[in-house]
């Protein structure tokens, strides 16, 4: 067992793990899991998840058992199947990335409140960003096809954020990105699409378009934040694409 005590530790510890360890277990949230995935990217070996974070989207995506015994069995005996990450500036993400209101909320989260209050920190940040909301516009080019949007969510699988299904047909073992593109419809539009997400009706959100792509180029307000797996990882302009190779992800036997 190795403990990550500061930013960058999880990636470094995974990268430097002794070769006799045939499986790397990431204990933490989606950001920690992504950091570990980046650490093993150059020489992939099976990655298992022990979900201890705020949202644990990837754990929900693959159906990690809730009980300790089930999790131990999965880590020890579960098959490692390929999962295709996304990539931003050479860094991998495993669940989702976002630009627009979504990323503004992540950027506004108070780390101290996140440690104490978990998901409440995101709710509080969302309320603040909604109050301060200013319409924005971005150009998104997905595999050569242009879109004009106010917000973009990119996922590798079905789920996003707190387990909301934005791409019900998506599979982690398919080398494509799933895009939810939302027109800029102001504060009311933000409320509408997030209400649709909460009630599992993202496909019916006003001004929503859905697509798949391997490469997405995004231009908009220079310096606007870009989030991936719940952490700010870049700023506009940015390119998001499918990673050049999959990682072996340990899953429950039922998967």
Regions found by a protein language model. Name each.
Residues 111-121, 162-189:
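Gly/Ser/Thr-rich active-site loops/lids in small-molecule metabolic enzymes
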Residues 1-24, 34, 69-70, 240, ...:
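ATP/NTP phosphate-donor binding region
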Residues 141-147, 171, 181-255:
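ATP/nucleoside-binding phosphotransfer catalytic cores, i.e., glycine-rich phosphate-binding loops
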Residues 98, 102, 153-166, 232:
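Glycine-rich phosphate/pyrophosphate-binding beta-alpha loops
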Residues 4, 41-46, 50-151:
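Catalytic core of DAGKc-family lipid kinases
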Residues 26-30:
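N-terminal glycine-rich "phosphate-gripper" loop used for MgATP/nucleotide binding
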Residues 10, 31-36, 57, 83:
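Short glycine/serine/threonine-rich phosphate/pyrophosphate-binding segments
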Residues 102-105, 148-149, 160-163, 187-190:
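Short acidic/glycine-rich loop or secondary-structure boundary segments that cap or lie
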